[in-house]
């Protein structure tokens, strides 16, 4: 069974250029997390807009004290991912809009292949939202999943693992499928 990695990022915002200020990942084998998660703060030496700070709480001062050089953090992340598929709750954002442009700025070749989008899978399985919307934290509250550190990359990765194992797997089994991973 091929390993895959659930990833998440926290960023400087939604408008380009977008810089990752935190990256997290959890290696999976089937539906089981294996090993320790990956986690890194990145210090790009750029200002963090107040709106982004309100979401994740990371200031430029915090990143100056706790962040790694982006090239170092991304190389460590690539080492963690290896040849596994990369999946995320919102893959088009985390992978296509955040990581790929950042890797190109740093001269890193984006890994292939990318995996699947958990948000898209969730929408396909449920059709309409079982909660008010498909936001990760809304679903976490609706399905009474453990409270994690919301709007931190590591907390969101852990919430996606919970959502996958507790909510999506039973839905997949109802459709006759049992393995959403590669």
Residue spans for each PLM region:
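Conserved non-catalytic scaffold segment of RNase H-like nuclease domains
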Residues: 1-113, 133-147, 151
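Acidic two-metal-ion nuclease catalytic site recognized across multiple nuclease folds
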Residues: 2, 142, 161-182
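Ser/Thr-centric signal marking residues that sit
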Residues: 9-12, 118, 159
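Short alpha-helix plus adjacent loop in nuclease-associated cores
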Residues: 115-132
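Conserved catalytic/binding loops enriched for acidic/polar residues
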Residues: 156
């Amino acid at each position: 069974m091929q390993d895959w990695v659930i990833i998440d990022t926290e960023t400087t915002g939604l408008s380009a250029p977008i810089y990752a200020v935190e990256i997290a990942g959890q290696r999976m084998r089937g539906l089981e997390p294996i090993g320790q998660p990956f986690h890194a703060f990145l210090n790009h030496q750029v200002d963090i807009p107040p709106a982004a700070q309100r979401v994740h709480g990371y200031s430029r001062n915090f990143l100056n004290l706790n962040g790694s050089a982006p090239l170092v953090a991304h190389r460590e992340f690539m080492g963690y991912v290896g040849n596994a598929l990369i999946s995320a709750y919102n893959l088009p954002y985390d992978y296509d809009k955040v990581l790929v442009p950042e890797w190109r700025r740093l001269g890193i070749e984006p890994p292939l292949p990318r995996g699947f989008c958990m948000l898209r899978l969730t929408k396909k399985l449920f059709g309409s939202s079982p909660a008010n919307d498909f936001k990760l934290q809304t679903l976490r509250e609706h399905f009474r999943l453990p409270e994690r550190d919301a709007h931190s990359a590591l907390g969101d990765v852990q919430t996606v693992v919970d959502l996958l194992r507790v909510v999506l797997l039973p839905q997949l089994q109802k459709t006759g499928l049992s393995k959403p991973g590669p």
